[in-house]
């Protein structure tokens, strides 16, 4: 009887605990539901668009990136205690999103004391490729950056050089080109932010919220860093003219003038005579050509790297008078100058901004050659009603056009400027919003139950860490879609690694798969099948050919299922891909067969002739490519058997023989077997 009473008492205690737990869960769910239903407004920009950052249990503004302190998820006292150090970083800018700039956009940087203009894509590609520690966040590649500074404005609206802490890149399928007054332009993604004027304040605005006629903020003048250099005003002016209109080699410097430029001709002759140079003058029609021989000057030009038609770094660091003389030499007393080199035109624009001059840019075509006309403007327009901004380094220009364009390289590029959230880039000095925000340190709990000294933890500590790991897994992967992505992306990495696919193909496949998840196309289909189809589509989009059979073997998914899923994704996601070109397979097949470059070139030539006659239409690209390689190997004496070629190409010997007969007959190729 006693044991029965004890059992009933135990059962009653368990029921009470279960009711308390249920009540606690219901209260927690109700509290979270109230947070969801309550309208959340960003205290910084006033936006109502928010994003849940499950990595840190935060709600983040989708526009400006502010972490909203009052709206944190409540995920338990143990986690809050463990994550206490992160709380001091609340209300920092740290949106889990990315903005982006096109590869070709110019940006002025300071590196190792040198100031130069480079393409942002070229700069970031170099940093990432040389980095030993690349961090990945989804499709984003992020690398630390040291020793590079870019121009950004401070709280007083003055520009200065500031250090870059991180750079990144990610695949992109579209860009938007913004053109403002003076034909200044920049290419960015739709989610990128530029700066405009609202209530006499400079504020960021997304590109997809812009319209023609809106006012954008650009740089009116850039900071000067002056150093004592061994260049005088006369040489600076001649140097500008050499870069614009002259050239030199190991023996001589050649300068060309119009006949009516007598004042400048005499000035040039007098200058070089003062340096004991040998001068020869040639005259033809209305042109005057001056040939100068002076070994010391030629060596100085080589040292300054003048031959590449870019403004030397030393000019960007020169005093105002030297820069002014250099610009006078470039323009040769005229208000406008035509440049064939876009890079030189970009350099001139940035140098003009350093001497507080502005310019318009017009793209023209002369004899089917694209040129860039830069016209100097000394009187800069500013809006006098904006009294707080009159003394700033800004100029305010209206938008003329917003056009959707293709990206230059398939990638978009980002960088982080701490404590500034902006930088200057683009053809004309656009002020762009800081692209990657610093999200602070991530909390990662090690799987080992050891302390910092390597000693084993007590049973209580191990139990606490077990619960913390469980909470971390829950907040990192919080819903079915994220669990799906976590598994799918690991499967994607496995398959692409097995196929030896480059990184940009992996990232394109990830974009396609993520798009399928967001549109709800995964339901009713296997994750492995959709991943394999996304990889096949990415291979075709990036022109890195892989057959369905190869992907089926690597993914362990049936070939027909991959094909069906691929067609479904292409239709629903509007993926437009051209038929695979047999030529794309030639380099890989030739490499695996150990054939020289001559055979590869001959096979490509055969396929080009076949395409012109329509022999590749309706034929499997791998079979046609294999037959062309077989024919080329026989013709050039590097013969491979049909069986060897068939094994590499993944086709049958019968297919090769059939394609071989078609090609030799219709192209009149005489092959001696």
Swiss-Prot record:
PANTHER family documented for this protein: TRANSCRIPTION INITIATION FACTOR IIB, TRANSCRIPTION INITIATION FACTOR IIB-RELATED
UniProt organism field: Methanocaldococcus jannaschii (strain ATCC 43067 / DSM 2661 / JAL-1 / JCM 10045 / NBRC 100440) (Methanococcus jannaschii)
GO biological process: DNA-templated transcription initiation; intein-mediated protein splicing; intron homing; transcription preinitiation complex assembly
Single annotated GO MF: TBP-class protein binding
Keyword Transferase: no
Listed Gene3D superfamilies: 1.10.472.170, 2.20.25.10, Cyclin-like (1.10.472.10), Hedgehog/Intein (Hint) domain (2.170.16.10)
Repeat positions for Sequence: 490-573, 584-665
Chain sites annotated for binding Zn(2+): 42, 45, 61, 64
Disulfide bridges in this chain: none
Cellular component GO terms, alphabetical: transcription preinitiation complex
HAMAP family reported for this sequence: TF2B_arch
Name of this chain's protein: Transcription initiation factor IIB
Post-translational modification: This protein undergoes a protein self splicing that involves a post-translational excision of the intervening region (intein) followed by peptide ligation.
Coiled coil start-end: none
UniProt keyword Thylakoid, yes or no: no
Residue intervals of the DOD-type homing endonuclease domain: 238-357
Purpose of the protein: Stabilizes TBP binding to an archaeal box-A promoter. Also responsible for recruiting RNA polymerase II to the pre-initiation complex (DNA-TBP-TFIIB).
EC code: 3.1.-.-
ZnF locations on chain (TFIIB-type): 38-69
The entry's keywords: Autocatalytic cleavage, Endonuclease, Hydrolase, Intron homing, Metal-binding, Nuclease, Protein splicing, Repeat, Transcription, Transcription regulation, Zinc, Zinc-finger
Similarity-based family: Belongs to the TFIIB family.
